[in-house]
Amino acid sequence: MNEKELIKYFRLLGLEVHTSTKARGHQGFYMRKRIDISKNISQERVIPTLLHEFAHYVHSEIEPFIEKNGGSLEVIFNDSEVTCYEEELLKVTNIVDAHSKCEKLIYHRNIIKNKISEYEKIIKQRYPKFMRSKKFKEFDKYIKKSEARYLLKYDRVKLISGVIFKKSRLLTIDNIEKDFTDMPCEFAAYIRLKSCQKRQGRVSAKINRLKKYYSKPTELFARFVEGLYLAPEQVKNTAPYTYDRFITLLNEGYYPFLKIVINMFLQT
């Protein structure tokens, strides 16, 4: 199977196919019978991406408004019990797209978590009753009179003073001890702890967004179809229940126009 053959078939179905766009920053993008493939992806990713986006089109033919709600596995597999499908499809997704595991982000979050624990230990050496969830009254009393209070909001801030002859002073979270020589080490640790908590929140939010995206039924289905091309035997072994149901529905004609495409690279 080659990409020209695939694109020709898609266009015969009335689909617009573009292979020289930015695809809205993605490898590929499907919307309202239009498939965009990024001009920036490698040649080996073109066919898998075409199949992925075509799977979205097929899904949209059996279930409307998937762009808004992500669709449902109940419709995709014409079954009311979908727990097994979901579990297997998530495993397939991890095979097809390593980014779906969020390993780098989780690793980064764990590093931040360890730093938070280290700063907490420093604080508790002098304030054993300190709790992250409670107000740190001793710190609050000190910080009100210190320019270091700006570091609670920003890791790096430039303070400008003077009306005619302006002076600037750069404060950073890395130079607290140098910039504020009178500050107790426990308070410096608390400022860094609060900074780490903000970073941890941002990383966790990104992980949650990615997991929500990858677990959308339409994305699970698209990566399943993509996986059948990239690693058919591995997909069969990883998702036997889903594969059997998919092949049954495929042969019954449940998925519009998909059987011809699947038969180009897979014996069903």
Features from the language model and the residues they span:
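Zn2+-dependent metallopeptidase catalytic core
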Residues: 1-14
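Active-site recognition of the HExxH zinc-binding catalytic motif
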Residues: 48-65, 222
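Post-HEXXH active-site segment of zinc metalloproteases
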Residues: 44, 60-103, 239-240
